[in-house]
Amino acid sequence: MFEAFIVAMASVWADSGFSALTSGNIIMICVGLVLLYMAIAKGFEPLLLSPIAFGCILANIPKNGFEQPGVMSVIMYGIHHEVFPPLIFLGVGAMTDFGPLIANPKTLLLGAAAQIGVFVSLMGAMALGFTVQEASAIGIIGGADGPTAIYLAAKMAPHLLGAIAVAAYSYMSLVPLIQPPVMKLFTTERERKIVMEQLRPVSKFEKVVFPIMCTIVISLLLPPVTALIGMLMLGNLFKEAGCLDRLSDTAQNALMNTVTIMLATGTGLTMSAEAFLNYQTILIICLGLVAFAAGTWGGVVFGKIMCMVDGGKTNPLIGSAGVSAVPMAARVSQIVGQKANPANFLLMHAMGPNVAGVIGTAVAAGTMLAMIGPVAK
């Protein structure tokens, strides 16, 4: 009987995850726990990092059976077949006010200038030995747009998706720490004190026409990005139409929350020890930081150029909001500007380049897809 008990226990042990647990699994479970701590205790993008971290822990449980058909395979399908990022964009569009951009269209140039971080990171990644597809997926981290980063990574470098997503969302949460030193380094105190004129009112007609025209023009120019831009602008049309409140509310709340859970958990599920624990992950994290700093620099420098051209009417600080971390980057512009001049209220001015950055990052992704093309699946 004792021998039968020993045999039974040995069988239980052999079937358990403990018997197949590797040092890599243990390290990645610890990474997941650290990310959970950062999200819950420190408030770093908790709505995104929490499910990513939990997905990371689940992915590193040996013999989890996730390769079998079931809910996890459905979630992974949504990640690898680019289902979730466009749905996230639908919710983002429903929550976005393009009024500041419509009122001051030249801020679209600031959103474009901030995309320099994407291409700086792309060239850096290629110099470090990444393929052009991998470098493109890494470069989009500089746009500070998690869904776009996941969308492009799934198409161009699915094996790097976990590292790219974690880098993108981690640095988005660190925008208040990364941007101010760059902003102060490349602006003078006099420039930071500039008070901008109040924006003009934007009519309902303009707000309704804007998403329709954006969809048509950008999609015709860059067909590969139609899914992202189309869903972003459809969500915004729900918001601005005035007769689609139920759809707008669903996109902003129920749908957005549901898809966020699926997208973030699925991203975490890609963070297996085999895929994550390599030198490429370290390079991606370093390149992501360079991309964020370069994007901030590009926006600020172009803001300085605009300031010189318009006779000192533009505060260069709003250029840093050209990265699409909405609305964190715009808030940072407001905080830095108000420290220099308590009478400064840059938030609405900064929202122009901030929402332009959302469009700019999607356009950058579409450009790379059109020029380079996705990897074969």
Regions found by a protein language model. Give the residues of each.
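Entry/N-cap segments of selected transmembrane alpha helices
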Residues: 33, 101-122, 272-299, 350-354
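N-terminal alpha-helical transmembrane segments of multi-pass membrane transport
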Residues: 1-70
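Interfacial helix-loop-helix linkers and transmembrane-helix boundary segments
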Residues: 40-49, 67-75, 95-110, 244-253, ...
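Membrane-embedded hairpin module used as a gating/binding unit in multi-pass transport
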Residues: 167-243
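Transmembrane helical segments that form the transport core of multi-pass membrane transport proteins
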Residues: 215-302
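Alpha-helical transmembrane segments
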Residues: 159-177, 285-295, 318-321
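Juxtamembrane and boundary regions of transmembrane helices in multi-pass small-molecule transporters
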Residues: 123-132, 164-192, 298-311, 356-377
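Alpha-helical membrane segments and immediately flanking helix-loop junctions
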Residues: 77, 81-82, 89-95, 110-120, ...
